[in-house]
A protein has these predicted regions:
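Terminal leader/tail segments of proteins
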Residues: 1-106
Length: 106
């Protein structure tokens, strides 16, 4: 995991606003939700017992890396985003499902 991704996860865990380079975490205290942005595009919302993931309009390696860092720290064991034949999928306990922007993981 990259240093920026460790810092991003620390901000999410500690419910803090944080920004470095192209990545930003905004903490919404009223909703108790962390929102993660990459290049100003929303890529994740993290609640107390759920994660909602987005591609931000760009299915890039950087987006996938940030999402996987979030899932490794805040998701369930084995959850990850991967690419096969140019299509994104989410690996979960029950197997792989096609990725769609806005999908919610519990």
């Amino acid at each position: 995991m990259r240093k920026i991704e460790r810092q991003m996860n620390a901000a999410i865990t500690n419910a803090k606003d944080w920004c470095s380079g192209n990545t930003q975490v905004c903490w919404d205290g009223a909703a108790q939700v962390a929102e993660v942005f990459l290049h100003g595009n929303l890529i994740a919302k993290i609640g107390s017992c759920w994660i909602q993931i987005f591609d931000g309009g760009w299915q890039s390696n950087t987006t996938k890396s940030r999402l996987n860092a979030i899932l490794s720290e805040h998701g369930l064991p084995g959850e990850c985003v991967f690419q096969k034949n140019f299509n994104w999928f989410v690996s979960q306990e029950g197997g792989a499902v096609p990725f769609f922007s806005g999908m919610r993981l519990n």
